[in-house]
A protein has these predicted regions:
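Symmetry-related core transmembrane helices of the 12-TM Major Facilitator Superfamily/SLC fold
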Residues: 166-183, 372-388
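Conserved MFS/SLC helix-loop-helix module at the cytosolic interface between two early adjacent transmembrane helices
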Residues: 60-97, 274-277
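Central cavity-lining transmembrane alpha-helices of secondary-active solute carriers
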Residues: 50-66, 257-268
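Juxtamembrane intracellular "pre-TM" segments in multi-pass secondary transporters
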Residues: 1-4, 187-218, 400
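Short amphipathic helix-loop junctions that connect adjacent transmembrane helices
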Residues: 28-45, 233-250
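Structural signature of the two symmetry-related core transmembrane helices
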Residues: 77-92, 171, 281-296
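Cytoplasmic helix-loop-helix junction between adjacent transmembrane helices
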Residues: 105-143
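Intracellular juxtamembrane helix-capping segments at the cytosolic ends
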Residues: 115-127, 319-332
């Protein structure tokens, strides 16, 4: 059995490569469509929507299947599968010559998804119970750091070598991730392998009969929806606050990245707090303070004030996912980790699909400022629901 610290160090590198490889490409896909693939400016919004949503659609369907296969045949093989298929999809992305081919590449990418759930499943099986919060907080912090680093690398590489080169770099790092799994990560132990629970033949539908896990899946979908509500209009909103200033694109990217910087710092601290105070309590607090922060974020009329709220949002929000992942780990049997994180990923993908649609509708009907207050209402309602459901009652693990 591997030392959990070694596993955490390797997975940290893995997650960093995975995160920045994704974010150094995704923000620039509309530019890739127009500059490299010849899409007309009037059609770019339509093609951007098709290209983005195609991945979510496939990954939503496949995530529970990959999770079930991981529990049956091992987490390591599924992680390797995801790394290599993602590497192939990025490589193909650098070769495409039409928007239709790019859509097919994104479909392949959706088929390949599942690396993050496998990272979570492997870490929760290796981590000591008393270090679970620290490990998941560290992983979330690194994921956030990669999401900040990615657009910076993507912009630099695109300026120097063109956008196609960025796809090949991403393919290289995902292939490197696959090699790390092949040579350095051992299949995690399965404490329940010979346990009587195996006789129960648990299915993914059993999760929906467990109130706590069902509620956490719903919470995961809501949180992801809130994240993506703002995505279609955030850069436009920042531009409207900035006005006519030099280096507008650079300034916009800097302001957006502030929440990622603060989140990378705060996530491990939230994880430690969850270990001491209880993850459900920390989840509730983090959602509540984020809801307050989103309401405040809709108030500033200057870029400087908005930048301060953006940094604060990262501090508040970064406690949500580590707590959510830890709750799922604590209340799931060891031989069900792959499936539960696959289901959580599916719930989050559904939120990812709903968020941009809702954000676009709100911005069109009520204006961009309304988005912040709707996000606040959703988050505050979720925090009150969690508080009244689990106040003074931190459920003990019940394995169906």
């Amino acid at each position: 059995m591997m030392n959990w610290k070694v596993v955490l160090a390797i997975l940290t590198c893995n997650i960093l490569f995975m995160s920045f490889s994704y974010t150094m490409l995704i923000p620039f896909l509309p530019l890739y469509l127009t500059d490299e693939l010849g899409v007309l400016p009037g059609d770019v919004h339509l093609w951007s929507g098709i290209v983005f949503s195609s991945t979510f659609l496939v990954s939503t369907i496949m995530a529970p299947i990959w999770g079930k296969l991981a529990d049956a045949h091992g987490k390591k093989p599924m992680a390797i599968r995801s790394c290599l298929f993602l590497s192939l999809s990025y490589f193909c992305g650098g070769l495409v010559t039409s928007p239709e081919q790019l859509t097919l590449m994104r479909l392949l990418q959706g088929f390949a998804y599942g690396l993050w759930p496998m990272d979570l499943a492997i870490m929760t099986l290796y981590a000591p119970e008393e270090k679970l919060g620290f490990c998941l907080g560290t992983m979330q912090g690194v994921m956030t750091a990669g999401s900040v680093l990615g657009p910076l690398l993507g912009g630099i590489l695109s300026d120097l070598f063109g956008m196609r080169f960025s796809f090949f770099i991403a393919a290289f790092f995902l292939f490197l991730n696959g090699l790390m799994f092949i040579f350095f990560i051992k299949e995690p132990p399965d404490p329940g392998k010979d346990d009587a629970r195996k006789e129960h033949h648990l299915t993914q539908l059993d999760v929906l009969r467990q109130p706590l896990l069902r509620n956490m899946l719903l919470c995961g979908a809501l949180i992801q929806m809130v994240i993506f509500i703002l995505q279609p209009v955030l850069s436009t909103y920042i531009t409207s606050l900035a006005g006519d200033i030099p280096n507008l694109t650079l300034t916009t990217g800097f302001v957006i990245s502030l929440s990622g910087v603060s989140g990378a710092i705060a996530a491990p601290l939230w994880g430690k707090a969850g270990q001491k105070k209880g993850f459900i309590r920390i989840l509730t607090i983090s959602i509540f303070v984020t809801g307050i922060g989103e309401a405040l974020q809709g108030l500033p009329s200057t870029l400087a004030a908005f930048s301060l709220t953006q940094f604060t949002i990262g501090l508040c929000f970064s406690g949500i996912n580590p707590a959510l992942n830890a709750i799922m780990a604590q209340h799931t049997p060891p031989d069900f980790k792959g499936r539960i994180y696959g289901l959580l990923f599916t719930a989050q993908q559904l939120g990812s699909m709903a968020g941009p649609l809702l954000g676009g509708i709100l911005a069109t009907w009520w204006g961009m400022k309304s988005i912040f207050f709707v996000m606040s209402v959703i988050l505050l309602a979720a925090s009150f629901w969690l508080y009244y459901t689990y106040h003074n009652r931190d459920p003990k693990p019940v394995w169906f």
